[in-house]
Amino acid sequence: MARKNDAFYFEAFCASADYSYQAAKLLSKIMHNFDPDRLEEAIDEMHAIEQAADERRHEVLDALVTAFVTPIEREDIAELSEYLDTVTDRIEGVLHRLYFNNIREMRPDALELVDIVVRSCELMRSLVGELSQFKKSKKLRQYVVELNTIEQEADDCYMRSMRNLHTTCTDPIVVFTWHETYSFLEYCVDYCEQVADT
């Protein structure tokens, strides 16, 4: 059973995972209802989520400085907090690429990838919710395996998307911009897997 002070860390992890999930859902909504003229407004909304996630991470790091005893190793708390924050940062990074690369229309491959990002963030959120019971949880290992499976699915989708992009598109600027966007979408899932593997 976690001590009262331990609950702070687990609640912070849950909040961070929830910010990632909120960011993923927002990105999915933006991409599925794509309107390039509304990206600036969307960036502001996404940045508010990212800032809240950053604040939560700083709270965890500040608490670590003064903590005498922690529920898990300090290094693991810091690393997990960083990975959770990086998921949200990467999701925001996808939106930035859509904006500053001036993408004017959405590609179906990107929608498939963003759907995988949402699923991985949702599963990561469930996994993190089990951490406070890590010694007794019957679901934790299952969530880790499922996240690893989703990451492999993202890798396969990424490879197909890149192949499709490079074999059907002749404009090098379009290839470059989508190459970068697909890569950032795949990074989001990679960091969800890092959370699972920590």
Model-found features: residue ranges?
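Cytosolic, long alpha-helical scaffolding segments
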Residues: M1-T198
